[in-house]
Amino acid sequence: MAKTYIFGHKNPDTDAISSAIIMAEFEQLRGNSGAKAYRLGDVSAETQFALDTFNVPAPELLTDDLDGQDVILVDHNEFQQSSDTIASATIKHVIDHHRIANFETAGPLCYRAEPVGCTATILYKMFRERGFEIKPEIAGLMLSAIISDSLLFKSPTCTQQDVKAAEELKDIAKVDIQKYGLDMLKAGASTTDKSVEFLLNMDAKSFTMGDYVTRIAQVNAVDLDEVLNRKEDLEKEMLAVSAQEKYDLFVLVVTDIINSDSKILVVGAEKDKVGEAFNVQLEDDMAFLSGVVSRKKQIVPQITEALTK
């Protein structure tokens, strides 16, 4: 059978990596023996913690040209967040929980998008709908993705469907949600040993917002100052990358995973629009955003609206 490439977005987070593995398992169970999970970037410390806990190898890094190849996208749909050769691929299926933008196909496809907190929640439902067995390691990855995307159920993107799925998955995976969840989030929140370049790319996405291209990077931390003490180096790199990639705005969101707040650092000609988006005044290119933790629900829509007025 022909190969089916399954992968999440560039700079993959735990949901992107886990959902690729889970979807490959789903496809195998329904008879697609050519289904294989891939990744579009390095595995984060948080994701590696989950993979190690449940003894699952990381997917292979995708380097193939996808021209004419069958692909399944998980946890994304926007082409700028996908493989560089996605436009010439044959997209067979999309499983996602984000907005739909900058996406088109030459032929029909299966597309499942739901307003839940995590792609893995949708995949959990798909397994249940088909009556497929959820192995302990698959349950563990589903649970890890839900915990990651919902910041242990604190994010406003989290729904009752996510919570219900997690409650059922913990029994299959045989873990304590609170203990495992906090350990996993903390594993990904240490930043002292990470370079500025790594921090700005570990969880970053590009968005087209009207006439502007905006880059939004997010870093989870236990101590915000641990990251922002390197403000000068961060700004220098953000400006350099913006010039190289032609970003109109670059926003770094540093999120406190304990207190559920964030600070933003913004560079770009339209940076004042970001302040307007949150009704705050940027001071030294920074602002504190109380209760803001979700890029998808609390950051992207607000900045998009400010830039497209």
Curated annotation (Swiss-Prot):
Cofactor field: Mn(2+)
Q: What is its EC number?
A: 3.6.1.1
Q: Where in the cell is it found?
A: Cytoplasm
Give, as one word, the top-level EC class.
hydrolase
Main subcellular localisation: cytoplasm
Q: How is the cofactor bound?
A: Binds 2 manganese ions per subunit.
Q: Does the keyword Metal-binding apply?
A: yes
Where along the chain is Mn(2+) 2 bound? D15, D75, H97, D149
Any one cellular-component term (Gene Ontology): cytoplasm
What are the UniProt keywords, alphabetically? Cytoplasm, Hydrolase, Manganese, Metal-binding
Q: Which Pfam families match?
A: DHH, DHHA2
Catalytic reaction equation(s) = diphosphate + H2O = 2 phosphate + H(+)
- State if Cytoplasm is listed as a keyword: yes
Q: Which GO terms describe its molecular function?
A: inorganic diphosphate phosphatase activity; manganese ion binding
Q: Which positions bind Mn(2+) 1? A: H9, D13, D75
Q: Which family does it belong to?
A: Belongs to the PPase class C family.
User: Which named protein is this?
Assistant: Probable manganese-dependent inorganic pyrophosphatase
Query: What is the native source organism of this protein?
Result: Staphylococcus aureus (strain Mu50 / ATCC 700699)
